[in-house]
Amino acid sequence: MSASQLETTEPADIVGQLQRAASAEDFFELLDVDFDPKVVNVARLHILKRMGQYLASEDLDGLPSAETKARCKTVLERAYADFVESSPLDQRVFKVLKDAVAPKSPRRPAFVSLDNLK
């Protein structure tokens, strides 16, 4: 989505605009959130995933568009702040990163009953 498209879209349907956004930068521009491109370049997917996690606990149905946009902006700012202060490895938003540090369950030795041997 180009900058001109972002500016000409109606502000009433911010959720729809966010769903059509083509990049993390579009989210920041749509919601008027300042960001450091260096942080976004490293953690773009992590920031958007965390934003989604935070939004899951928000009830946006039936809210006026200005309130919806304000809540989305607050959630994006919170998600972005998580990655300004620490790295994606520290935050472990994605399952693959969580699994990398999960304690391994002890492996049971293979057991074959003598009755099964012939």
From Swiss-Prot:
Which top-rank group of organisms is this from?
Bacteria
Keyword annotations from UniProtKB, A to Z: Nitrogen fixation
The family database entries (Pfam families) matched by this protein are listed as: NifW
UniProt keyword Hydrolase, yes or no:
no
Gene Ontology BP terms: nitrogen fixation
> Can you tell me which family this protein belongs to?
Belongs to the NifW family.
Subunit (UniProt)? Homotrimer; associates with NifD.
In UniProt terms, what function does this protein have? Answer: May protect the nitrogenase Fe-Mo protein from oxidative damage.
Protein name (Swiss-Prot/TrEMBL) = Nitrogenase-stabilizing/protective protein NifW
- Name its species: Rhodopseudomonas palustris (strain BisB5)
Please spell out the taxonomic lineage of the organism that makes this protein. Answer: Bacteria, Pseudomonadati, Pseudomonadota, Alphaproteobacteria, Hyphomicrobiales
